[in-house]
Amino acid sequence: MTEQAPLSFTPAVGDTPLTAKQRRLLTLAHELGRDKFAGRAALWDREGSFPFANYDDLREAGLLRLCVPEADGGLGADYATYMFVAAELGRFCGTTALTYNMHICSTMWTGVLADGIPMSDQERSEHLRRRQIHFERVVKDGAVYAQPFSEGSAAAAGRAPFGTTARKVEGGWRINGRKIFASLAGAANYYGVLCTEDKGDDKRDARDTLYMAVPADA
């Protein structure tokens, strides 16, 4: 077995065994943070502004598609690899790493995490069809996804139905509700709203939870 050359830096996660893919992505994140993010970090903190320039760099480097499966044009990173990359970005710009987490999680919910959820063949086929729509937006358009889940209740933990509802209407869905917080607000291209399907019977059930990717210009 060929011994891998040591990294030229000590990663944020410390001395831990890494695969060749993890080493490559960690190096990419380190160089991006060192050369681009570090010099801008104080500006975002001082102004309380969004790091749009950093997202342009993430997009150009292909890191917005980090956890999109390779079969769908992404880099196919698993959860551990994402953690390593996020930690490395965070050592140079906390603002970017925090908001980046929200975008990446949107691709993981429908990607590697959903792959571990039992589904019937029909459900799996429909899930794969739908998630490809979102993955194409990230891969081809460099789209950024936000996650407005929070409502100040137990809904986000799965212990209650979401107060935000979605009702099927002619031409699509009508979403009605209020979210109290969303990282990437004002910067995302799509907002992944978790809501409860309104079936017209006034009976809300957590099992009727829907994920609605609402365009920013809707």
Residue ranges and their predicted role:
Residues 178-218:
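A short core secondary-structure module
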Residues 14-15, 40-41, 68:
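Glycine- and acidic
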Residues 2-21:
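Intrinsic disorder at enzyme termini
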Residues 32-42:
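N-terminal capping segment at the start of a domain
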Residues 25-32, 49-65:
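N-terminal glycine-rich anion-binding loops that anchor highly charged ligand groups
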Residues 52, 59, 66-176:
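Glycine-rich flavin
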Residues 43-45, 75:
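A generic secondary-structure micro-motif detector
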